[in-house]
Structure formats: C-alpha cells, structure tokens
A protein has these predicted regions:
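Charged, low-complexity intrinsically disordered segments
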Residues: 1-104
C-alpha cells in the first residue's frame, strides 16, 4: 500500500502512525538517491515533446518552459536550467497562465 503524507510532517510522527512505513522523499529537497525521481532533477537529454531535436535537462523545465502567459510566451532558455532552482514561472511575474504550447 502507498500512502502520501505532507512533506511538512516530521518523520517521527509518520512512523508513529505507520510503524512499518518505508519513507520515500521524492521531492527536489530529498537527502538520498530518490531525489532522482523529482521532476526538477537534471537528468539531461530529455526530449521536448513535439519539438524535433530539442532536449531539456529536466521534466519541470519542459513544463515551465512551454507554459504561455498573458505577458510572456514560451521560454526555451528554461530547458537548459540544471540547477534545480529558479525553474518556476509565476503569475506574479508573467500574468495569467494561458496554457502550454504543443512544442516550440
């Protein structure tokens, strides 16, 4: 059985509730090798859908890079972000999101 708990909960409290649990942190802040399951992890060479020959460092860079806003089009520079930081493109900066472009 798989249970999902808030990242904000302490490990100790999760283990009290589920004593036999194996805790798998797959966020971009994970401390072990499971960090590789985070959409922010820069594996590199991930094909951008519907974009012949275009690749990105991570899944989140594709998602954010293809996002279109009222005040901004796609951001292909995002595809090269390998820092796991500054990947989010926000409403505050770019306006209302209109959706995602089908490729570049």
């Amino acid at each position: 059985m798989i249970l999902i708990e808030s990242k904000r909960k302490k490990y100790e409290n999760i283990l009290k509730k589920h004593p036999d649990a194996i805790i798998a942190d797959v966020t971009s802040h994970a401390k072990d090798s499971l960090i590789k399951l985070s959409p922010f992890y820069p594996h590199g060479g991930i094909p951008v859908p519907f974009s012949n020959g275009v690749t990105a460092t991570c899944v989140e860079a594709i998602w954010q890079g293809l996002k279109v806003f009222e005040g901004a089009d796609v951001d292909v520079q995002m595809f090269q972000n390998d820092t796991m930081k500054n990947i989010k493109r926000t409403v505050r900066k770019y306006g209302k999101p209109l959706g995602h472009r089908k490729g570049v």
